[in-house]
Amino acid sequence: MSLFRRNEIWYASYSLPGGKRIKESLGTKDKRQAQELHDKRKAELWRVEKLGDLPDVTFEEACLRWLEEKADKKSLDSDKSRIEFWLEHFEGIRLKDISEAKIYSAVSRMHNRKTKEIWKQKVQAAIRKGKELPVYEPKPVSTQTKAKHLAMIKAILRAAERDWKWLEKAPVIKIPAVRNKRVRWLEKEEAKRLIDECPEPLKSVVKFALATGLRKSNIINLEWQQIDMQRRVAWVNPEESKSNRAIGVALNDTACKVLRDQIGKHHKWVFVHTKAAKRADGTSTPAVRKMRIDSKTSWLSACRRAGIEDFRFHDLRHTWASWLIQSGVPLSVLQEMGGWESIEMVRRYAHLAPNHLTEHARKIDDIFGDNVPNMSHSEIMEDIKKA
């Protein structure tokens, strides 16, 4: 077992009983403390190997090892965010002392952390301006959020039991079933209202999303080197796509027009701010700067002004897909255009294009034998208005 330093932090390198070589952070810059932790870990491993003891590991040590082993995971930032929640409840607690009851108790008290962060910012602003402090009103989280946090701690504790041999038996954690919500999409008139209410550069981003179906992160992180205007194609790199494979995006006239309007604003990023903005501390941002993926203020304000409720940015992708399906695009083609990994992920839009079932449904007409006129949608609506 040896010690080495990386970026001022001390690490230990050692071999497991099975021969596997492991490197782990000791979480300290102090060499003496690192040596003490090293010796403790060495003695612990000896007891595990020779006596069959389980190591006395805390929850944060398990979290640290998880993050180190999953360093290349695309959704690592999401893992960190969920781990941060669990550390609020189990920091300093030994793994063997974490029970199902304690886990469920923590989840039952979950509140939206973003709401609390916004409240804290408002408190600081009120203090600076000498105004009355706002009251904190906790916002409950969805079943889906609870399910994702439970899945996170379940994965860590399962790894502690099966892979790291730090637990004799991990708690049995049941993940609540999450119902698939309806596909939320906009009518063309609603989309036009939303676009009209969006300030730049959000307006261009929304247009591009509706024209291509790309996810927000792919649009905000889009670079000029990923675009070939002559061939009318854009590329999403494998490390940036949800399916972990490269995606070619066909650029229609609308998308090309949006891109041409961005030329000359930045040498690298396609979509950027061009006007300075005030920060919470009163300072100003640079005029030309990359857009933030997590910024929602302008989006929510535009939706409110347009009279559109319960609509997320990702629903623009649903809108794009819904429009294509209603225009007669086959599911298999939509899957390729949207870069979905399986056809099952596209079937959520199938109900929007039931026209291919019409001929089969007409078999019932043959059974009744009635002479039923084949009326168009406009004719039917006209008759309804007359009634």
Swiss-Prot record:
Q: PROSITE patterns this protein is in?
A: CB, TYR_RECOMBINASE
Enumerate the spans annotated as Core-binding (CB) domain: 57-161
User: Where are the catalytic residues?
Assistant: 215, 242, 314, 317, 340, 349
Tell me the keywords, alphabetical order.
DNA integration, DNA recombination, DNA-binding, Viral genome integration, Virus entry into host cell
> Where on the tree of life does the source sit, at the highest rank?
Bacteria
Q: Which GO terms describe its cellular component?
A: cytosol
GO BP terms: chromosome segregation; DNA recombination; symbiont entry into host cell; viral genome integration into host DNA
In this UniProt entry, which cysteines form S-S bonds? none
Entries under Pfam families matching the protein: Phage_integrase
Q: Which residues form the Tyr recombinase domain?
A: 181-362
* One example GO MF annotation: site-specific recombinase activity
Miscellaneous note of the record? Encoded by the cryptic lambdoid prophage DLP12.
- Function of this protein? Integrase from the cryptic lambdoid prophage DLP12. Integrase is necessary for integration of the phage into the host genome by site-specific recombination. In conjunction with excisionase, integrase is also necessary for excision of the prophage from the host genome.
**Member of which family?**
Belongs to the 'phage' integrase family.
> Which PANTHER family does the record associate with it?
PHAGE INTEGRASE-RELATED, PROPHAGE INTEGRASE INTD-RELATED
List the protein's name: Prophage integrase IntD
Q: What is the lineage of its organism?
A: Bacteria, Pseudomonadati, Pseudomonadota, Gammaproteobacteria, Enterobacterales
Gene coding for it: intD
